[in-house]
């Protein structure tokens, strides 16, 4: 019971943070003094933050419905999913003056997954990584072959991932976790990614580096042949 309460507290805190930022931005808008460009920039920030918060709420709803078996598995283009994530997050990267490099090295493009769940996993990895990139050390989204699996990895340059969190990710997160050494990191996002990975029979893992962490998901490759038209 205590663990459930703790998990709910972490989830509530993460969902409260964007609301607080949105309130601050809204209060800072001065329609009499601000230029049109400044007002448009603030509006765009509000839209970006609200979209990310809504996505987390939607993802939590999906987590609660996983046991209903409503999310079908099918051959999915992992490159298409990654491109979709990059397109949706581009305004968020730009507003933070950050960039995410994409490197697609896999020969296999089709995986067996649910497209919505896979999108959410990669999306959460990328939103975590943007906090730990600079123009000199930009984060990297990569796709590579890994035996009968296809691996999607997001490399960041943040503080070392605590051993306890690394072990929890390895064993499968059972509740949202607070990543105190990585204040920009979303424990709720990692929890969602862990749940979705398990549902799709994919493997979620984290690799610690001296100067950051790579969050990865390995998805079963599809034997179906992809045709280009």
Locate the predicted segments by residue:
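Conserved C-terminal segment of the DHp
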Residues: 21-36, 66
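Short alpha-helical segment of the dimerization/phosphotransfer core of two-component systems
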Residues: 45-53
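Conserved micro-motifs of the catalytic ATP-binding
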Residues: 67-72, 110-113
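Short conserved segments within the C-terminal catalytic ATPase subdomain
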Residues: 92-102
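Short conserved segment of the HATPase_c
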Residues: 161-175
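Conserved glycine-rich
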Residues: 201-202
């Amino acid at each position: 019971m205590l663990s459930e309460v703790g998990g709910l507290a972490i989830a509530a805190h993460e969902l409260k943070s964007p609301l607080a930022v949105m309130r601050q931005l809204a209060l800072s808008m001065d329609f009499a003094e601000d230029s049109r460009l400044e007002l448009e920039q603030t509006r765009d920030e509000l839209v970006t933050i609200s979209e990310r918060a809504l996505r987390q709420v939607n993802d939590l709803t999906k987590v609660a419905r996983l046991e209903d078996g409503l999310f079908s598995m099918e051959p999915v283009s992992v490159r298409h999913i990654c491109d979709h994530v990059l397109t949706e997050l581009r305004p968020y990267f730009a507003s933070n003056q950050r960039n995410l490099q994409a490197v697609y090295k896999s020969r296999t493009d089709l995986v067996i997954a649910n497209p919505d769940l896979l999108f959410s996993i990669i999306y959460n990895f990328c939103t975590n990584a943007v906090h730990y990139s600079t123009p000199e050390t930009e984060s990297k989204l990569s796709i590579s072959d890994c035996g009968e699996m296809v691996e999607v990895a997001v490399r960041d340059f943040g503080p070392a991932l605590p051993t306890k969190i690394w072990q929890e990710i390895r064993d499968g997160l059972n509740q949202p976790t607070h990543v105190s050494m990585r204040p920009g990191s979303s424990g709720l996002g990692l929890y969602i990614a862990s749940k979705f990975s398990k549902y799709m029979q994919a493997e979620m893992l984290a690799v610690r580096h001296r100067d950051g962490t790579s969050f990865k998901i390995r998805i079963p490759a599809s034997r179906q042949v992809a045709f280009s038209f």
